[in-house]
Each structure stands twice: as structure tokens, then as C-alpha cells.
Amino acid sequence: MLCGLICAGHPQAEGVWLAEVEPVFPQGDLLAEAATRQCLADLNDLAKRTRAGIEGPEIGLRVLLPTEEAPLRERAEAVYDWCRGFLYALGLAGVGERDLSGDTREVFRDLSDITRLDLGDLDEGEENEAALAEIVEFLRVAAMLFHKERVAAREWA
């Protein structure tokens, strides 16, 4: 979701994202309040690193997904969830398919297609591993393409 908000050019991307994911603990519980402060600090750090990866001079975005040691199904479900979050964020930022150029419109449709995949019969295997690796790389490039079109192009104009 955070990547989608940043790539869509939402002016308050981090704040909107934090409002969606911020943990809520009972007030008056000092341990919970300390945990909340630490969690928020960690989330803010993640937001800064994500923005730096997207906006930095090098292609440094790292899509936050389970490691390759995780089962294939778990990683595929995380990709599915990442795509849903990215598309949800575009909607929050007011970006629809009609607002996109040909390339990003195609990427938008591809991301949407990923959210409709049936992961129920996904088998472990080299072919599926290779396909998932390609999709993960596609996500990274897709996010950068959205940012280039929605944000960077306006900054350079």
C-alpha cells in the first residue's frame, strides 16, 4: 500500500499509510504505549527507506515480501496481497485506469489480473518458482514506472 501511495504521488503518503496500519493498544498500559512508540518508529523508518528506494537515483526499490526460504504459496499470497495494496492505494490517491498512459494502464491491468489468480492449486516446483521470481521483478519495475509517470515527470516539467 505504501508503495502505491508514493508512486501515485499522494501528498501525504506516509501519513495515510500509517493511519491504515498503526497498531491500537489500550491507553494507560505503559508497556503497550512503549511498544506502540517503537512500532511507529519502525514503521516510519520503513516508510523513509521505501521512499528512498523509489525516489533515489538508483533503482533501489526492494519489494517487501517473504524470503525465498518461505514456502511458495506463502510468497505467492504475499505477492497477491502486495498487488491488492498497491491498487487500493492508487484508488485512495484518486488514480484510476483512465488517468494512466498506455504503458501504465497495461501494468495496472496486469496487477489487477494478479489479484484474480487462483492460488489454491499452486504447486512447489521450479517452473512456479521461476514464474514467481519474474512477477516479483515485474512488481518492482511496475512501481518504478508508476512513479516515473505520476510523480517524477511532474517534478521534471
Segments (PLM) and residue ranges:
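Domain-length accessory/inserted modules outside core catalytic folds
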Residues: M1-C83, L87-A157
